[in-house]
């Protein structure tokens, strides 16, 4: 092996070690939960309180009336303006949430920018119901 070939092999090995964590497959639960969250957020981003309420999971609908959800959308989400950018910061899973029955929950934190708020956080809680992830909590910070 020539010196150039050896150097390239060593550099390739170092690059492979450096990039190895990126090559691991993402937890399939994270992909599924994030896809469900994106679908729900696409509805919420249209400021359609009725449709986002209907698309949410049963615990969401049990905790809020359609009227209260509509008021929250008008008071909190509407003033933020159009979505500019949304990036997943973290997705975690748990079976226990304070004040809730044990179940499969996904907690997804986003870094989000809107036209009228440069940087904020969105926190979504999803529950696996009937094999599907459904939004059961939504907070903007």
Question: What are the residue ranges of the model-derived segments?
Answer:
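Exposed beta-sheet edge and beta->alpha loop/turn motif
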Residues: 91-141
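Short solvent-exposed beta->alpha transition segments
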Residues: 34-36, 50-103
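A generic structural signal for ordered secondary structure
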Residues: 20, 65, 69, 120-127
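Short, low-complexity N-terminal intrinsically disordered segments enriched in polar/charged residues
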Residues: 2-4, 12, 19-46
């Amino acid at each position: 092996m020539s010196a150039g070939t050896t150097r390239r092999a060593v550099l390739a090995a170092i690059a492979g070690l450096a990039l190895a964590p990126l090559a691991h497959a993402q937890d399939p639960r994270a992909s599924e939960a994030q896809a469900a969250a994106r679908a729900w957020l696409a509805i919420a981003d249209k400021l359609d309180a009725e449709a986002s309420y209907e698309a949410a999971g049963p615990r969401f609908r049990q905790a809020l009336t359609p009227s209260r959800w509509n008021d929250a959308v008008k008071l909190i989400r509407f003033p933020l303006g159009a979505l500019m950018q949304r990036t997943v910061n973290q997705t975690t899973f748990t079976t226990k949430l304070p004040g809730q029955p044990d179940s499969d929950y996904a907690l997804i934190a986003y870094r989000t920018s809107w036209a009228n708020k440069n940087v904020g956080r969105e926190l979504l809680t999803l529950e696996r119901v009937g094999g599907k992830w459904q939004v059961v909590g939504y907070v903007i910070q």
